[in-house]
Amino acid sequence: MFHEFHACQHADAPTLVLSSGLGGSGRYWADDLTLLTRDYHVLVYDHAGTGRSPAVLPADYSIRHMAIELLALLDSLDIQRCHFMGHALGGLVGLELALLRPELLHSQVLINAWSSPNPHSARCFSVRKKLLLNSGPEAYVQAQALFLYPADWIAANGPRLADDEAHALAHFPDTDNLLRRIHALETFDVSAELSRIHTPTLLIANRDDMLVPWQQSRHLANALPNATLVLLEYGGHASNITDPLPFQRALRAFLSTQP
């Protein structure tokens, strides 16, 4: 899979692996790299079947497949221990990593994640699939901001959104791949296994998230044996982009306590 390794100036710094959401592109984390590389070597990657990682995804593709693909990448780079941060679908990958290879993870940060399907998110993904199949990629991409960002942020960031949408359209994934990735997150359910995950975990959720109810993170915080929840008031589904300072404070406070 396509990946980029952003080195910290401190050679002995720990490694932090970043996993993006449904779009799958490592580009999602661009705004965070300057801060994170002060203290960490940072690995970003494009998920299989997205962006610069071309692949034909199998019909039974799952979040576990995604975790196994990431493990293969980490093995190829001889990364034996790391911190992990995942956004939405990327957070689900983190939960699978913690189940498949718990000794890999120093800690994990899960942003607006969940452990099982919920009716609201299911409705959102149903609408997005219909947009893709009935109106095409352009409508799908233009609607994406409505699910990710607060209304006032959208209104104030037209030029950035136009650039992001042009890039997304230019690198739009194969329709079958995208539908299989959506199906993977729609059917993901590790609720019965959460008590097995002892990895130190920070859950960051946003009260105004239009895509994933923040109560999903509260459930994770209650079910995981070693988890902390930070609930942010503003930022939508992607507050590391829309309101980065509160997000960064929560992230740094947690990571500073991890070895």
From Swiss-Prot:
Q: Which UniProt keywords apply?
A: Hydrolase
Tell me yes or no: is Hydrolase among this UniProt entry's keywords: yes
Q: Which InterPro entries does the entry mention?
A: AB_hydrolase, AB_hydrolase_1, AB_hydrolase_fold, Pyrimidine_utilisation_RutD
Recorded GO molecular functions are: hydrolase activity, acting on carbon-nitrogen (but not peptide) bonds, in linear amides; triacylglycerol lipase activity
Q: What class of enzyme is it?
A: hydrolase
Its EC number is 3.5.1.-
Q: Which domain of life is it from?
A: Bacteria
> What Pfam family is a match, any one?
Abhydrolase_6
Q: Which reaction does it catalyse?
A: carbamate + 2 H(+) = NH4(+) + CO2
Which Gene3D superfamilies does this entry report, sorted A to Z?
A: alpha/beta hydrolase
Q: Which GO terms describe its biological process?
A: glycerolipid catabolic process; nitrogen utilization; uracil catabolic process
Kindly give the NCBIfam families that the UniProt entry links to this protein: RutD
**What does this protein's UniProt record list under function?**
Involved in pyrimidine catabolism. May facilitate the hydrolysis of carbamate, a reaction that can also occur spontaneously.
Q: Which family would the database say this protein is a member of?
A: Belongs to the AB hydrolase superfamily. Hydrolase RutD family.
Q: What is this protein called?
A: Putative carbamate hydrolase RutD
